[in-house]
Amino acid sequence: MAMSSYMVNSKYVDPKFPPCEEYSQNNYIPEQGSDYYSSSQDTDFQHPGIYPRSNYTEQPFGCTAVQEPTVPRGHVHDKSGQPSPFNAQTESGAPVLVAGPRTCGQQQNTKSQNGTQAKQPAVVYPWMKKVHVTTVNPDYTGSEPKRSRTAYTRQQVLELEKEFHFNRYLTRRRRIEIAHTLCLSERQIKIWFQNRRMKWTKDHKLPNTKGRSAPASSHLQSIHKDQTDITSL
């Protein structure tokens, strides 16, 4: 017991010796008295009379300055009987909410909510909408339905005939004026004038200009051939 206390309180490094059994058998280690160990112990020991201990009170660190009675070292103080200031605040005031770390699922939910709020609804223009047939036609073959023919009134036909008598071809500006006057569309005016010109050509039976140009070109070719023959002679 004395040897172990000497090794602990000594300031020197513990040397490496052979096993103690050999030294104990050969009486290499002499037995030291109690005065030897007491002298080494007195070097590190401070007498309480010479160096008195200062009366220092330890103050705990907390939210509020609450002084606790000093407890000598080596003793355990039971704090179960004394309420803590943090518990008193939570009981008297509103409950304190501590925001813990968010989980992966909560972060994904917040990202999805932000994405849905930032995403705006797509704009659907009229030309993007597809017109569906509401009624089912058993005779429908799959082709586009024919447009209904325009039934012109006598007043409209009379005004169109008068215009065709002076001008068989209309400019776009004049076509807009007639369509506005007769309450028709430009397309209807254009189609009527096309049909009227075809009828007028059929009634007058004009000769084909392409047929007349063919013999004239052949006649010119024959004349040019004769001239080349004469020059060759």
UniProtKB/Swiss-Prot annotation:
Residues 145-204 bind DNA. InterPro entries: Antp_homeobox_Deformed_sf, HD, HD_metazoa, Homeobox_antennapedia, Homeobox_Antennapedia_CS, Homeodomain-like_sf. Keywords: Developmental protein, DNA-binding, Homeobox, Nucleus, Transcription, Transcription regulation. GO terms for molecular function: DNA-binding transcription factor activity, RNA polymerase II-specific; RNA polymerase II cis-regulatory region sequence-specific DNA binding. One of its GO terms (biological process) is anterior/posterior pattern specification. It is found in: Nucleus. Pfam families: Homeodomain. Coiled coil: none annotated. Residues 223-233 have a biased composition (Basic and acidic residues). Belongs to the Antp homeobox family. Deformed subfamily. This is Homeobox protein Hox-D4a.
